[in-house]
Regions:
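Glycine- and charge-rich intrinsically disordered segments
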Residues: 1-56, 224-293
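OB-fold ssDNA-binding interfaces and closely related basic DNA-contact patches used
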Residues: 2-165, 292-293
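Extended aliphatic helical segments
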Residues: 12, 19, 63, 79-81, ...
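Generic alpha-helix signal with a bias toward terminal, lower-confidence helices
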Residues: 92, 141, 209-211, 229, ...
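Aromatic-enriched hydrophobic runs in primary sequence
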Residues: 126-127, 210, 285, 291
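Extended serine/threonine-enriched, polar tracts that run as long, contiguous segments within proteins
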Residues: 149-224
């Protein structure tokens, strides 16, 4: 009789640093900074930098740095503080319009369950995603306008990530072609907010010979209790605000090569890879770590 393989215990990563840009500031300095920020009338919502997936099957993430420049990173090691699914329906193909308003979806859902029409005569109408005709397979259109096997409404997932020793919060939007794999990987590490993970990209090729990038999430270690408690509190704060983060076409599209539009409609091979049974998969809910705050 074959012996069952015992799960490998994850090492506690005591060297992983959860830092704040305000560490070391006196109460007086913090109060002065608060006054300065309020005077700048900053936008409400969650302040975070972007992580983009490259086009053309690239294997390095494009991570937003200082002054909006980007730094290529083959791997990203950090903590998934919060994650949620979201969906957006754009009737036009990417790059088919120069109107900035067309970046906004006609309908958007911040939980993948209930959508709200964003523009047009039916603005404000509430839509049930499961039964919406645009959220069914076979309703997608490719760049040429031909029917494709995917969904017209694009199912995605947002990951809010903290990196080691970095005070900035980062946002990665997982595209439809990586949804199934990422959901399965998150399920293996749940509850996820006390786990350190490493994200990478694998090059894949669709049936038409076009390369694309797939998101890979692997377990790396476990946070010590004190750091896990800090992440749990940050999770609570993001959960209270995440629905204020607008969904735009930038969430759905890859970082393009210069001068090239990106075909973001999954082809048959990609559709088969992400269609595990027809239903959108949800990762397990977050279980708070450390003491209740």
């Amino acid at each position: 009789m074959a012996q069952q393989k015992k799960p490998t215990a994850l090492a506690v990563m005591n060297d992983f640093q959860i830092v704040s840009r305000y560490d070391g500031m006196t109460p007086e300095d913090l109060e002065e900074l608060k006054d300065q920020l309020e005077d700048l009338d900053q936008d409400t919502g969650i302040a975070c930098r972007s992580i983009k997936i490259p086009s053309g099957g690239g294997t390095a993430y494009e991570v937003q740095g200082e002054d909006d420049d980007t730094d290529p990173m083959k791997t990203i090691t950090g903590v998934v503080v919060f994650t949620h699914r979201l969906s957006g329906y754009w009737p036009n193909a990417y790059g088919s319009s120069n109107n900035p308003e067309d970046k906004l979806p006609t309908c958007a859902s911040m939980d993948g369950k209930t959508g709200i029409v964003q523009k047009g005569d039916n603005t404000g109408e509430v839509i049930t995603c499961k039964t919406c005709p645009w959220n069914q397979y076979g309703t997608a259109r490719d760049q040429a306008g031909n029917q494709a096997r995917g969904k017209a409404c694009k199912n995605m997932r947002r990951l809010y990530i903290l990196m080691d020793g970095d005070p900035n919060l980062y946002l990665l939007t997982v595209p439809p072609t990586s949804i199934k794999d990422v959901n399965n990987q998150l399920a293996k590490i749940a509850p996820y907010a006390d786990k350190v993970v490493t994200l990478s990209l694998e090059k894949a090729t669709n049936a038409g010979g076009t390369p694309y990038s797939k998101v890979v999430v692997k377990r790396t270690g476990v946070l010590p209790p004190a750091a896990a408690a800090v992440v749990s509190e940050l999770h609570r704060q993001i959960k209270a605000q995440y629905q204020n983060m607008a969904l735009t076409m930038d969430d759905y599209t890859a970082a393009p090569e210069r001068g090239k539009a990106v075909d973001v409609t999954p082809d048959d091979a990609e559709w088969e890879a992400m269609n595990g049974g027809g239903d959108f998969q949800e990762a397990p809910p977050h279980a708070p770590q450390g003491p209740a705050l």
